From Swiss-Prot:
Pfam families: Orbi_NS1. This is Non-structural protein NS1. It comes from the Viruses. Belongs to the orbivirus non-structural protein NS1 family. InterPro entries: Orbi_NS1.
Length: 552
């Protein structure tokens, strides 16, 4: 391969096409209809490597360039390329897959330094909590910011606590007859008194040890209190509570409209659209008057998801009046996965998702109808059938497939997914890392990308492999800010032509190895032992990375 490319000075997109076609040629099925595939009676599409060797040995540049043109022409049909790649890579060969993965890893480690990603990792603040909680907009703790009242007075508390700067005010929901906006002038004095009293009685956060002022209040059902004593439950619920407060603090600012559109898919006219959507009187099949009342009056269980507001189900109710019953049923039965509920309980194969940020970056609509796939579990990414311009996405612990009509849209959609779900720590034997490489491979092979987009894709590959590896001082970079992350990925330096060619070869080989490895493990072909990642080699790469960090 390298001899052929260098001998005939083939570079750039033509070299990338030649590398790709060489890998899929053994499984290529050709009809020979155009007859342009036949050289001396041999189909070069099915025997590409033999034709390359023959053209190199015979020093026939005309044939060599014809081969390259055939490879480039084949790349125009990206759907066929993806299917042929998937078919070819899932077949085991007698090769050192493990060794090739390690060589790709070493090259990506070098690219991590040269691409500017390591410089950006140095600039990031240190991650305070290494157990990252993955949040998305499909669930919300927003109902708990609204003030429960009875005869115009705030309902008395039965217990108080705090999470950092947020006061937790526990009460009996049955004692309330309505819920109101916490900014209303008539209750500001009482609201401030609650904050002062919680700050006086509990000067240290029981979850984090934070000692500081209390600035906000969340009104929680007393039934929740025992579950907040469970570490994992509290950790996740507290993060959603914090996110709800951040959204509430944007009320009255320009960002409020973005938040409302992201959560509900529509923005009502008038002031304070967030409060309107939460407190508006709804025609619910129960006596509840608003979605806040419906949520607060229904207890969950030991699953933290069962206490939050299911935004996907709510959007179904907003779009179809008769589906408000689903909202009540979902909470009454304490479901935890909205996509499972739609797919299995309601036999709905598709639902709407909203991504305002991706819309702003690509110019496409923020609304997408997506096909509901399988719940997160063994092999679910690799078993998902992707056709035409589909790409995998994820809401909570459930996969879906969405249509991406351009390479830019596929790149940004995948980058947002990877930022939320994939953590590359330099040790690549977990399923999350394999999922990330698979998704990036789909973008690399299925869509026609520009050199700038492939440069961004390389930075994503580096992030998937090494983004959360410890720095020289042992701290882990904090990549939690999505806007900052996308700026680094999408606005980084563009690779030169030589760098682009080498990066494509590395990414292509890594994808090929991952698909081969995953399918070999599952199918158990006779005579092919699925390789495992050796700890010693991982340590060697980690040592090399440590040496690189010392330079910064």
């Amino acid at each position: 391969m390298e001899r052929f490319l260098r001998k005939y000075n083939i570079s750039g997109d033509y070299a990338n096409a030649t590398r790709t076609f060489l890998a899929i040629s053994p499984q290529w099925t050709c009809s020979h209809l155009k007859r342009n595939c036949l050289f001396n009676g041999m189909c070069v599409k099915q025997h590409f490597e033999r034709a390359m060797i023959a053209a190199t040995d015979a020093e026939e540049p005309a044939k060599a360039y014809k081969l390259v043109e055939l490879a480039k022409e084949a790349m125009y049909d990206r759907e066929t390329v993806w299917l042929q790649c998937f078919k070819s890579f899932s077949q085991p060969y007698e090769e050192d897959v493990e060794g090739k993965m390690k060589r790709c890893g070493a090259q990506l480690l070098e690219d991590y330094r040269k691409s500017g990603m390591m410089n950006e990792a140095v600039k990031q603040s240190a991650l305070v909590n290494s157990e990252r909680i993955r949040l998305d907009d499909s669930l919300s703790a927003m109902p708990y910011i609204y003030v429960p009242i009875n005869d115009g007075q705030i309902v008395n508390p039965t217990f108080i606590s705090r999470y950092r700067q947020i006061a937790y005010y526990f009460y009996n929901p049955d004692a309330a007859d309505d819920w109101i906006d916490p900014n209303l002038f008539g209750i500001r004095g009482q609201h401030n008194q609650i904050k002062r009293e919680v700050e006086r009685q509990i000067n240290t956060c029981p979850y984090t040890g934070y000692r500081g002022r209390v600035f906000q209040v969340m009104f929680l059902p007393i039934q929740l209190i025992n579950f907040l004593r469970m570490d994992d439950f509290a950790k996740r619920f507290n993060r959603y509570a914090s996110m709800a407060i951040q959204q509430y603090l944007r009320v009255g600012y320009a960002e409020e409209i973005r938040y409302v559109q992201q959560l509900f898919g529509r923005v009502p006219t008038g002031e304070f659209p967030l409060h309107q959507m939460m407190l508006m009187r709804r025609d619910l099949p129960t006596r509840d008057r608003s979605i806040v009342e419906a949520r607060v009056r229904r207890s969950g269980d030991e699953n933290w998801q069962s206490w939050l507001l299911p935004m996907i189900i709510i959007r179904e109710g907003l779009d179809h009046q008769d589906r408000w019953e689903w909202f009540i049923d979902y909470m009454d039965r304490k479901h935890t996965c909205q996509l499972c509920y739609l797919k299995h309980s309601k036999q709905i194969p598709a639902c709407s998702v909203i991504d305002v940020r991706a819309s702003e970056l690509t110019g496409c609509s923020p609304f997408k109808m997506v096909k509901i796939e399988e719940h997160v579990g063994n092999d679910s990414v690799f078993k998902t059938k992707l056709v035409r311009d589909e790409q995998i996405g994820r809401i909570g612990d459930h996969y879906y497939t969405t249509n991406c009509y351009t390479g830019a849209e596929a790149l940004i959609t995948t980058a947002i997914h990877i930022h939320r779900w994939i953590r590359g720590s330099g040790i690549w034997n977990d399923e999350g890392w394999q999922e990330g490489i698979f998704m990036l491979g789909r973008v690399l092979l299925r869509w026609e990308l520009t050199k700038a987009q492939r440069s961004a894709l390389l930075r994503l590959f580096c992030f998937v492999c090494y983004g959360y590896a410890p720095r020289a001082d042992g701290t882990i970079p904090d990549w939690n800010n999505l806007g900052n992350f996308l700026d680094i990925i999408l606005k980084g330096p563009e690779l030169s032509e030589d760098e682009d060619e080498r990066a494509y070869a590395t990414m292509f080989e890594m994808v090929r190895c991952i698909i081969t490895l995953c399918y070999a493990e599952k199918v158990h072909y006779a005579g092919f032992a699925a390789p495992a990642c050796e700890g010693g080699e991982v340590i060697n790469l980690a040592a090399r990375m440590s040496q690189m960090w010392m330079e910064y």
